[in-house]
Curated annotation (Swiss-Prot):
Pfam families in the cross-refs: Cpn60_TCP1 (PF00118)
Annotated keywords: ATP-binding, Chaperone, Cytoplasm, Isomerase, Nucleotide-binding
Function in brief: Together with its co-chaperonin GroES, plays an essential role in assisting protein folding. The GroEL-GroES system forms a nano-cage that allows encapsulation of the non-native substrate proteins and provides a physical environment optimized to promote and accelerate protein folding.
Lineage, broadest ranks: Bacteria, Bacillati, Cyanobacteriota, Cyanophyceae, Synechococcales
Annotated spans, Disordered: 525-544
Similarity comment: family membership: Belongs to the chaperonin (HSP60) family.
Disulphides: none
Organism from which the protein derives: Synechococcus sp. (strain JA-2-3B'a(2-13))
The protein, known as: Chaperonin GroEL 1
Keyword NADP: no
Polar residues bias (residue ranges): 528-538
NCBIfam families: GroEL (TIGR02348), PRK00013.1 (NF000592), PRK12849.1 (NF009487), PRK12850.1 (NF009488), PRK12851.1 (NF009489)
């Protein structure tokens, strides 16, 4: 396909125009009085949302060159979302402001490479300053405040996430599910839960709730498929003599062996439940090992020289209680604290070493399950459209609270960045010169953009609000919800330091890339061909 090549000022202006469109669509959602954006969907109802990165992902322009600008600024939002899970709108607004300021300087003859160096140095200085001003999150009240702000000033959501974090601990997993009712509910699971249920409904002990509950059972853990009854008979005899229930976790159980278990269960010879092993491949082996450590048992595997027919009771795990439903198995074990602690430490090291986001997520899940912390928030809403919006807000709120726990909190509502304007300006004057100084100053001017936009979305004059905030102490900012200047920590208007830092770093990275762009190579649009059908052939005016 033929390519179109555009150079220098024309190239930068085309990128800028694409960025203007995306930044405006995203910026309208910023702050407590930000508006919503409606996204048309090819299938199903339109989506009404308030989430910067979701809006950014939807925007595709007809002009290929402008669309390149959209893709660049979208990266600032996406990368911030990946790193901190929130702050995507702030990152977009900051990147846009830096590009606008920078292009003026490039047009006036500044050296783009020196500008970028100045931007990078200023951002490094600002990141250190943000860390200096961050306060650690010490109680669930602070967690509730962060979550409420991130969920669009929804205090009920803030309280719920704080409660969930309180119960599952800071390493616990808080997951979201679509609820069946109008209200949003929190469900906390005690013990380790994995998403495999009983193989046969004949194992059920409570027919009303359709679940099997085993008190103080033995747990047989194996990574092989059980096909022969002969393999199981010695195991069943030992457990029957001990007079305790049995949970079997295996790759699969073939019909003949399964029938034997069901018959024993129905005759009352043995209380038994069989479930399939969770996960796949290497992850399955690791999860079975986790279950074995939690329950004080061994994984019976031929790789380790252990055979099922030779298995003895002392290689089985034990638990206080096991509950098995159609879809899930929950094991509540006690004791083995030292072994579990060592295993958790090992998983933590793996989390630090891995580069894959997916692997990190799965390892984090395993860590949470081992330390007994999984909370599920069931999102309720009147309509599907509202449900999707609430789910996105809750996702942001959960990510924001985790970020706050990691790096602490700073005054929210664009306040921190606004107060750092005079600080970075003074530092730049003392340490930089020439175009590097110009680069640092353009960062300083861009820092006021989020606060200015929050005020404008609340119907105020953004520049006046910004100047008034800059004259006040560091913790004082603008409360757009109540149109007042308040101590942001006391008012509970706080942002995670990690979110503010990530938004600034990613915005500066994209701005630096755009300013140092000298040429754009894009596909030439294909010429539109006129179809003969449309010219007087008696066809109707409608497109089909």
């Amino acid at each position: 396909m033929a390519k179109s090549i555009i150079f220098s000022e024309e190239a930068r202006r085309a990128l800028e125009h694409g960025m203007d469109i995306l930044a405006e669509a995203v910026a309208v959602t910023l702050g407590p009085k930000g508006r919503n954006v409606v996204l048309e969907k090819k299938f199903g109802a339109p989506q009404i949302i308030n989430d910067g990165v979701t809006i950014a992902k939807e925007i595709e322009l007809e002009d290929h060159i402008e669309n390149t600008g959209v893709s660049l600024i979208r990266q600032a939002a996406s990368k911030t979302n990946d790193t901190a899970g929130d702050g995507t709108t702030t990152a977009t607004v900051l990147a846009h402001a830096m590009v606008k300021e920078g292009l003026k300087n490039v047009a006036a003859g500044a050296n783009p490479i020196a500008l970028k160096r100045g931007i990078d140095k200023a951002v490094k200085f600002l990141v250190d300053k943000i860390a200096e001003h961050a306060r650690p999150v010490e109680d669930s009240k602070a967690i509730a405040q962060v979550a409420a702000i991130s969920a669009g000033n929804d205090e009920e959501v803030g309280r719920m996430i704080a409660e969930a974090m309180d119960k599952v601990g800071r390493e616990g997993v808080i997951s979201l599910e679509e609820g069946k009712s109008m209200t949003t509910e929190l469900e906390v699971t005690e013990g380790m839960r994995f998403d495999k249920g009983y193989i046969s409904p004949y194992f059920v002990t409570d027919t009303e709730r359709m679940e099997a509950v085993l008190e103080n059972p033995y747990i047989l853990i194996t990574d092989k498929k059980i096909t022969l009854v002969q393999d199981l008979v010695p195991v069943l005899e030992q457990v029957a003599r001990a007079g305790r229930p049995l949970l079997i976790i295996a790759e699969d159980i073939e019909k003949e062996a399964l029938a034997t278990l069901v018959v024993n269960k129905l005759r009352g010879v043995l209380s038994v439940v069989a479930v399939k092993a969770p996960g796949f491949g290497d992850r399955r082996k690791a999860m079975l090992e986790d279950i074995a450590i939690l329950t004080g048992g061994e994984v019976i595997s031929e790789e380790r020289g252990l055979k099922l027919e030779n298995a003895r009771l002392d290689s089985f795990g034990t638990a206080r209680r096991v509950t098995v439903t159609k879809d899930n198995t929950t094991i509540v074990a006690e004791g083995n604290e030292a072994a579990v602690k060592a295993r958790c430490e090992q998983i933590r090291r793996q989390i630090e070493e891995t580069d894959s986001t997916y692997d990190k997520e799965k390892l984090q899940e395993r860590l949470a399950k081992l330390s007994g912390g999984v909370a599920v928030i069931k999102v309720g809403a009147a309509t599907e459209t509202e449900m999707k919006d609430r789910k996105l807000r809750l996702e942001d709120a959960i990510n924001a609270t985790k970020a706050a726990v990691e790096e602490g909190i700073v005054p929210g509502g664009g306040t921190t960045l606004a107060h750092l304007i005079p600080v970075v300006t003074e530092w730049a004057q003392a340490n930089l010169s020439g175009d590097e100084l110009v680069g640092a100053n353009l960062v300083a001017r861009a820092l006021g953009a989020p606060l200015r936009r929050i005020a404008e979305n609340a119907g105020q004059n953004g520049s006046i609000v910004l100047e008034r905030v800059k004259d006040k102490p560091f913790n004082t900012g603008y409360d757009a919800q109540n149109d007042a200047f308040v101590d942001m920590f006391e008012a509970g208007i706080v942002d995670p330091a990690k979110v503010t830092r990530s938004a600034l770093q990613n915005a500066a990275s994209i701005a630096g890339m755009v300013l140092t762009t000298e040429a754009i190579v894009v596909d030439k649009p294909e010429p539109k061909t006129n179809t003969p059908a449309s010219s007087g052939s008696g066809m109707s005016d409608y497109d089909y």
